[in-house]
Amino acid sequence: MDITVKELSKNYGEKEVFKNFSATFKGGKTTVIMGKSGCGKTTLLNCISRLTDYNGEISGADGVSYVFQEDRLLPRLTVYENLEITLNDFKEEEKISKIKQILSATDMTDKATKLPEELSGGEKKRVALSRAFISSGKTILLDEPLNSLDLGLKRKIDEYFLNFSESEKKTAIYVTHDVDEALFVADTVIILDKGKISWAYDFTTDKKLRKITDDESVKVREKLINLLF
């Protein structure tokens, strides 16, 4: 199901972030949002997830999982238990299979019995991402989810996200400043500027077949760099 935003308006005190903003995010696809700091990226995610009040209409965002810039793990639960609580709708065998799969994909199998306080910042981020990936909801909002991770792990998690979001038909809205990351995961990329969409692009190449060196990727990369930096 598409996520539809109609005539969204949002102020923080005297600061106007959005005024009559409208957009459609395609169901089962990943839309990457980019833009300079303060353009409204995080505010838009907060509105879609109903974490803040707003004027306007937002529909289609059901069963939302939100990966914040900071991890929000339950401190008294182990890594395994933090993942397990998102899977109440699944049978026990399915729970075990999903958790084992995501722990392996994120190199966290040996951390399953650890508490959050025993993890590094990057490890906590991986658990937070994993929890969103395996939830039963069909909408994932990601706010710069891989900032604290090294490049190799970023690409590994992006690849898992790519496969999992497609197989589970997840609708994802993914905020990042990393152009290469956007090229890797996006079906559509948009740039926000002062609460408006200043540029948007729908990829024609299947992202599973896409390479950074493809003509389309090179063209989009150059455009993004020119507009953002």
State where each predicted segment sits.
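Conserved structural motif at the start of ABC-family nucleotide-binding domains
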Residues: 3, 18-20
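Helix-to-loop junction immediately C-terminal to a conserved catalytic motif
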Residues: 49
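ABC-type ATPase nucleotide-binding domains, specifically the catalytic core motifs of the NBD
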Residues: 53, 81-96, 105
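Conserved ABC ATPase "signature" region
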Residues: 93-111, 161-163
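Conserved ABC ATPase signature
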Residues: 115-119, 123
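Hydrophobic anchor residue at the start of the ABC signature
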Residues: 129
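Catalytic Walker B motif of ABC-type/P-loop ATPase nucleotide-binding domains
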Residues: 140-144
